[in-house]
Amino acid sequence: MGRQDIGRQDIGRQGQELPAYRPISSHLAITPPVSVVIPAMNEAQNLPYVFRTLPEWIHEVVLVDGDSTDGTVEVARALRPDVKVVAQRGKGKGDALISGFAACTGDIIVMVDADGSADGQEIVSYVSALVSGADFAKGSRFANGGGTDDMTAIRKLGNRVLCAVVNAKFGARYTDLCYGYNAFWRHCLDEITLDCTGFEVETLMNIRVVKAGLKVQEIPSHEYDRIHGVSNLRAVRDGLRVLKVILRERGVPRSTRRRPVALRISVPAGPRGEAS
């Protein structure tokens, strides 16, 4: 069975029936509410799979719609009537994420792409890391247990180089920089500034949580191929954009870092979008 068929049916990637829920360990029985933010533009064909893999104990799903014309919003509401839809007013993934973060009410926020490349059932691992003491749970395709079906040799090399630069410049220990499947405590929204509207916002977050002295834990994650549609990623162009973000950030020496009470993400003034 091909991925196209899998994307259209409520079944797993290998053809097996997905469980009605993902068992949670006993220490997660009192997990705080979890919000999942999904930026989407013309992802109607992929949403059935994305929504189906989300654990049933998720408190809230926030779909940030980038003016889709293929019925993305209608599909989302049909699949999950309680979905919170935010109409993105600006452009870019960073703008979409900032709009989504502002609309979240959960104590934990998870970032998930709408193309079906991320397995929603991995969210339990992210939440477990946060409940166990991490401030920021960073997905990694190259940590032990992770993997990817969607990375060319040039992208892999570029990611490795950019990751090495960030680790050297900011004292991080990342194994995967350019991967946006992350989760964090909502109180983090009070402490760092996100002033990037493009996809580079993910790199900016990765750098600034380290600069702030937050506890970061990598989570092994498997990236799958996009189910439907074509990715607009361009290895060289996008790599240069990420490099610019890295170079403009000022590193803070380890000796002067202190662990803050919280991490702030200051949302720019003015309306980010309309929730419905």
How would you label these PLM feature ranges?
Residues A20-S25, M41-E56:
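Short, well-formed alpha-helical segments that are part of the catalytic scaffolds
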Residues I38, F51, H59-S68, V86:
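Short beta-strand/loop segment that forms part of the nucleotide-sugar
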Residues I109:
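Short aromatic/hydrophobic "clamp" motif used to bind/position activated sugar donors
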Residues G2-R3, G12-T31, K169-G171, L194-S276:
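Hydrophobic helical membrane-anchoring modules
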Residues H59-V62, V73-A103:
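Conserved donor nucleotide-binding strand/loop of the catalytic core
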Residues Q88-A103, Q121-F199, R226-L243:
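Acceptor/aglycone-binding surface of glycosyltransferases and processive sugar-polymer synthases
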Residues D65-V73, G116:
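A conserved acidic beta->alpha catalytic loop
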Residues P33-S35, E60, L204:
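Cell-envelope/extracellular polymer assembly enzymes that use nucleotide-activated donors
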